[in-house]
């Protein structure tokens, strides 16, 4: 007779991505493999002394680096994913309140006049209409076209990157993707949004990001492109 061993393991959602959604910069984008702010804070407070320099060879969404900065530590993080390096360095950036105000005005001006067209670029995703309703997709593509002409494509301008992070959040929020569990699935139907609905949502997302970007960080963190299996080439970076 086979005996099954059942382990009563407590679920700690406070140690997962679910905990991060209301914590400023940590909630900019939801990536389900991320661990929580709470877990990193507990580990840093337990194991680090005043002059500790923190190393994270698997940066991911840069949770470790950002928490380190918030607690006044310096941190160096590594990753091989260009998107995560871009996202992590933007999240860990020290922003000027004055320049954020200028960015807010630039964004507001950009959103005043959006020209709709079916001819604007969309990503070459198979069965893309499973992700977005055709009407919604046209609106998103039109907004993206206007953003690219105003702020250029995502690059090393950390202020403009805030706009692109907000847009990334927008395309997730308006998609048919369901994130009610760790893996991703699709809702039965995509939603057709109006231009006014998408603009209001985008503005709300961007305003939240701008507000959290104003929070001053006391430490310093950076994400470097590197393979965690061999960091010797990076010396004492």
Give the ranges of each region predicted by the language model:
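Conserved phosphoryl-transfer catalytic core
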Residues: 81-150
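Short, charged/polar micro-motifs that form catalytic or ligand-binding hotspots
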Residues: 26, 30, 78, 130, ...
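Conserved S-adenosyl-L-methionine
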Residues: 36-39, 43-112, 194-235
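Hydrophobic (often cysteine-bearing) scaffold residues that line and stabilize catalytic clefts
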Residues: 32, 36, 84, 136, ...
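Short linear capping/connector segments at secondary-structure termini
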Residues: 20-22, 121-126, 183-187
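SAM-dependent nucleic-acid methyltransferase catalytic core
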Residues: 137-237
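Short amphipathic alpha-helical segments, especially helix-boundary/capping motifs
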Residues: 13-20, 62-63, 114-120
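S-adenosyl-L-methionine
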Residues: 1-50
């Amino acid at each position: 007779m086979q005996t099954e061993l059942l382990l009563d393991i407590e679920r700690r959602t406070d140690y997962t991505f679910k905990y991060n959604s209301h914590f400023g910069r940590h909630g900019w984008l939801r990536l389900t493999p991320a661990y929580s702010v709470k877990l990193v804070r507990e580990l840093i407070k337990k194991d680090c002394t005043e002059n500790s320099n923190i190393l994270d060879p698997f940066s991911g969404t840069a949770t470790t680096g950002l928490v380190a900065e918030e607690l006044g530590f310096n941190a160096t993080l590594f990753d091989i994913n260009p998107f995560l390096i871009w996202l992590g360095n933007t999240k860990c950036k020290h922003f000027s309140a004055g320049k954020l105000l200028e960015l807010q005005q630039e964004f507001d001006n950009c959103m005043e006049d959006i020209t709709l067209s079916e001819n604007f670029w969309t990503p070459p995703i198979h069965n893309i209409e499973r992700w977005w309703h055709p009407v919604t997709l046209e609106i998103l593509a039109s907004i993206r076209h206007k953003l690219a002409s105003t702020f250029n494509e995502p690059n090393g301008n950390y202020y403009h990157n805030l706009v692109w992070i907000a847009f990334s959040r927008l395309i997730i929020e308006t998609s048919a993707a369901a994130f009610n569990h760790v893996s991703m699935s699709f809702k039965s139907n995509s939603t057709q949004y109006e231009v006014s609905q998408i603009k209001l949502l985008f503005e709300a997302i961007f305003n939240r990001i701008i507000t959290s970007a104003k929070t001053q960080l006391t430490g310093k963190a950076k994400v470097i492109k590197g393979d965690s299996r061999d960091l010797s080439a990076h010396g004492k970076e």
